Swiss-Prot record:
It comes from the Eukaryota. The chain crosses the membrane at residues 33-53, 77-98, 113-133, 178-198, 226-246, 288-308, 320-340, 347-367. Keywords: Electron transport, Heme, Iron, Membrane, Metal-binding, Mitochondrion, Mitochondrion inner membrane, Respiratory chain, Transmembrane, Transmembrane helix, Transport, Ubiquinone. Belongs to the cytochrome b family. Component of the ubiquinol-cytochrome c reductase complex (complex III or cytochrome b-c1 complex) that is part of the mitochondrial respiratory chain. The b-c1 complex mediates electron transfer from ubiquinol to cytochrome c. Contributes to the generation of a proton gradient across the mitochondrial membrane that is then used for ATP synthesis. This is Cytochrome b. GO terms for biological process: mitochondrial electron transport, ubiquinol to cytochrome c. Binds 2 heme b groups non-covalently. It is found in: Mitochondrion inner membrane. The gene is MT-CYB. Heme b b566 binds at residues 97, 196. A ubiquinone binds at residue 201. Its cofactor is heme b. One of its GO terms (cellular component) is mitochondrial inner membrane.
Length: 379
């Protein structure tokens, strides 16, 4: 009798994706983040669903409804903080996942990589809109500042901003539509994840060496299911430690004040995971230039396959590229730090230098170093 797992039309798809999938035998813990991102998405959708049952998207009651969730709903505080800190875990996993892709040359799978970059954009948009929903001071002013950036687009900018706002300022219409989009986007993300996996399974996974591993594959289950479960436990441990011991560690105290259009907070800043992009935006004095730099700081990821000039795929055997990669990581940490600082000396110049270095490393230094390493191979 044939196995149902291999013949049933629906279970067969799951079997080929998570059970009998041939996987390289040498993939390290850096390959765990895909499954962890799936877990993060599931946590966010579930906690978000329960929050949406009690939340009201009206400027008069939004802040109170979040307070009500935390005080009166059974385990509402837990659901709310799991959702807020779950977003932070989501972005930590995202950054590590993208970093892994850059280090080991996974971007040579064009379709998988490009869908991944689109996913990054959509997740960032979703997180931004979610941050607006509690309707605290930072929610309101963050929404005002970031949506206002679109006014830098020539000719249609101002009209576009008013169209997004649904009026002449961030108000009830803006909050309602942000809630609607914040609810629907995670499901669009889930659909894009399916496409991401579809393209990945066309080629098979990359591995640390960057070499073709078809001659040495092992089944995904039980080897990598067990390995993923370890990652899952570690992620939940970190998330729940954060949620139960210091849930507001990564948040902004200003968001515990209800939104007030008449009082601007001293330092408007986004959540920590957007600070690097915010620092790049602020480091350019021109509004349109800043917006372009902001968009290009993420969009530049799509150029990596074109800028890959090395004869080797992975950085595993390329010490010079490794060195530049870690300088880039340090630069991103610097940008994140600067994004949270006030706009004054010496932070302005540090931010500008870090922004220039970010683009120079990616566009010039990494490709140049790759060519040098190609020459060194002939020694």
């Amino acid at each position: 009798m044939t196995n149902t797992r291999k013949t049933h039309p629906l279970i067969k798809i799951i079997n080929h994706s998570f059970i009998d999938l041939p996987a390289p035998s040498n993939i390290s813990a850096w390959w765990n983040f895909g499954s962890l991102l799936g877990l993060c998405l599931a946590i966010q959708i579930l906690t978000g669903l329960f929050l949406a049952m009690h939340y009201t998207s009206d400027t008069m009651t939004a802040f109170s409804s979040v307070t009500h969730i935390c005080r009166d709903v059974n385990y509402g505080w837990l659901i709310r903080y799991m959702h807020a800190n779950g977003a932070s875990m989501f972005f930590i996993c995202l950054f590590l996942h993208v970093g892994r892709g850059l280090y080991y040359g996974s971007y040579t799978y064009f379709e998988t990589w490009n869908i991944g970059v689109i996913l990054l954009f959509v997740v960032m948009a979703t997180a931004f809109m979610g941050y607006v929903l509690p309707w605290g001071q930072m929610s309101f002013w963050g929404a005002t500042v970031i949506t206002n950036l679109l006014s830098a687009i020539p000719y249609i900018g101002t009209t576009l901003v008013e169209w997004i706002w649904g009026g002449f300022s961030v108000d009830k219409a803006t909050l309602t539509r942000f809630f609607a989009f914040h609810f629907i986007l995670p499901f669009i993300i889930a659909a894009l994840v399916m496409v991401h996996l579809l393209f990945l399974h066309e080629t098979g996974s990359n591995n640390p060496s960057g070499l073709i591993s078809n001659s040495d594959k092992i089944p995904f289950h039980p080897y990598y299911t067990i390995k993923d479960i370890l990652g899952v436990f570690l992620l939940i441990l970190v998330l729940m430690t954060l949620v139960l011991f210091s849930p507001d560690l990564l948040g902004d105290p200003d968001n515990y004040m209800p939104a007030n259009p008449l009082s601007t907070p001293p330092h408007i800043k986004p959540e920590w995971y957007f600070l690097f992009a915010y620092a790049i935006l602020r480091s350019i004095p021109n509004k349109l230039g800043g917006v372009l730099a902001l968009v290009f700081s993420i969009l530049i990821l799509m150029l990596f396959p074109l800028l890959h000039l090395s004869k080797q795929r992975s950085m595993m055997f390329r010490p010079l590229s490794q060195c530049m990669f870690w300088i880039l990581v340090a630069d991103l940490f610097t940008l994140t730090w600067i994004g949270g600082q006030p706009v004054e000396h010496p932070f302005i110049i540090i931010g500008q230098l870090a922004s220039i270095l970010y683009f120079i490393i990616i566009l010039l230094i990494l490709p140049a170093v790759s060519l040098i390493e190609n020459k060194l191979l002939k020694w």
